[in-house]
Every structure is written in C-alpha cells, then in structure tokens.
C-alpha cells in the first residue's frame, strides 16, 4: 500500500517537474520573428555607430557586453540617450526597442 502511494506521488512530482521545465524551455526559446525584426532596426538605426558586429572599436559601447539582467539599463539608454548616443524615444516604438533587445541578446551570446 505504501509502495503504491509512493509510486503515485513520484509520478505526480515527475509530471509536474517535466511540465514546468517544458514551459520554461518554451519561454526561453528565442522568438525568431522578433530577432529578424530587431536585425532590421539595428542595421538601419544602430550599426552606423555600433558597428556591424555590435562593437565599434571603443568608439561606442560594446553591445556584446550587455547581460540579460541589464534590460532596464538598455531600455533607458535607448529611450533617453547616454553620453554621445542620442535619445530614440519617439523615433523607435516600444516594439522596435523590444525587437532590438532580442536581436542584440542573441548575437551578444554568440560572440
């Protein structure tokens, strides 16, 4: 009796754990549409200063160094500008900034 109860509990725990890990994997999967749209935004608005490879030989911030937890910093810099970078608030939509973030994060991870 105890063995059956233990087996049932183990199956439930495994099922819940598997479901949660599958859901996390789904959430973590890169959104290819956002990445492609972000590439367009980057190439038309950012590459001229930040370079084709997210870095411009010390002239601008090396975007490859952005960490996943720096999203608020990124959003603030893009919207309000920083140092020599002009503000893009009113030029780029929230969706474009989000797309840009996804593009940079995927490519920064690969560098």
Predicted regions and their residues:
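C-terminal capping alpha-helices of c-type cytochrome domains
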Residues: 78, 90-111
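Residue-level detector of conserved, well-ordered beta-strand and adjacent loop positions
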Residues: 64, 86-89
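Short cysteine clusters
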Residues: 46-49
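Gly/Gly-Pro-rich "capping" loops immediately C-terminal to redox-active cysteine motifs
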Residues: 32-39, 51-82
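N-terminal export/targeting leaders of redox proteins
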Residues: 1-32, 111
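Residue-level detector of flexible, active-site-proximal loop/helix-junction positions
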Residues: 23, 70, 92
